[in-house]
């Protein structure tokens, strides 16, 4: 009978309360924006295969399907979390380029991966966003530390955390609380992406 409150996870069970961001919809919108801006080969870079990670990956696939584009598994790359650093991401992308993988955008599941993509662009002389568009996820302070500043998906983490506390207190006080609360993300546009092209 101990209540459980999950952060950004979903689990249907009595006395379990879930507060999460709609990661699938958010990543679908981010991929859509890149495709609508003229990007043809978007590299999706991620490091986690947890519930949130699976929803993000599904969103990418949904966007490609909506644009009648096939899913190229070579462009869906899981980054080794054991080597998780900005410079390691840069080196990984440089290696992919040396192997012949072509991409004109990087959509990352976390801002730190996107910053690594920005470092890659700087290292190989690709101009952002003219030659490479980059989008991160979480809208962290890292977004303001790049040049140009990083476009990122704001997954409303502060609001989610507030709602978790409200839910937990409500449950402990005996009030009826919603079993599932889903927040809608927002894409914060900055200088690392181009505007949508006219159709």
Spans of features found by a protein language model:
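Phosphate/oxyanion-binding loops and surfaces in catalytic or ligand/nucleic-acid-binding neighborhoods
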Residues: 37, 51, 63, 67, ...
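Short acidic capping loops at alpha-helix termini that bridge into adjacent secondary structure
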Residues: 41, 71-75, 127-133
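Hinge/beta->alpha junction and helix N-cap segments in small-molecule ligand-binding domains
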Residues: 18-29, 45-92, 107-115, 137-140, ...
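Short acidic/polar active-site loop segments enriched in Thr and Asp
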Residues: 39-41, 104
């Amino acid at each position: 009978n101990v209540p459980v409150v999950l952060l950004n996870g979903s689990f249907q069970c009595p006395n379990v309360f879930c507060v999460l961001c709609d990661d699938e919809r958010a990543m679908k919108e981010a991929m859509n924006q890149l495709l609508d801006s003229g990007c043809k080969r978007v590299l999706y870079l991620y490091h986690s295969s947890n519930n949130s990670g699976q929803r993000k990956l599904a969103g990418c696939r949904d966007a490609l399907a909506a644009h009648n584009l096939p899913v190229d598994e070579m462009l869906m790359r899981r980054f080794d979390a054991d080597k998780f650093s900005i410079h390691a991401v840069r080196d990984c992308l440089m290696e992919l380029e040396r192997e012949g993988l072509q991409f004109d955008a990087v959509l990352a599941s976390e801002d730190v991966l996107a910053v690594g993509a920005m470092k890659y662009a700087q290292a190989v002389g690709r101009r952002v966003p003219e030659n490479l568009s980059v989008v991160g996820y979480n809208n962290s302070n890292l977004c303001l530390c790049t040049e140009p500043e990083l476009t990122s998906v704001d997954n409303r983490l502060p609001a989610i955390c507030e709602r978790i506390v409200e839910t937990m207190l409500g449950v402990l006080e005996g009030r009826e609380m919603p079993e599932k609360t889903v927040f809608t993300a927002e894409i914060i546009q900055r200088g690392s992406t181009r505007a949508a092209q006219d159709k």
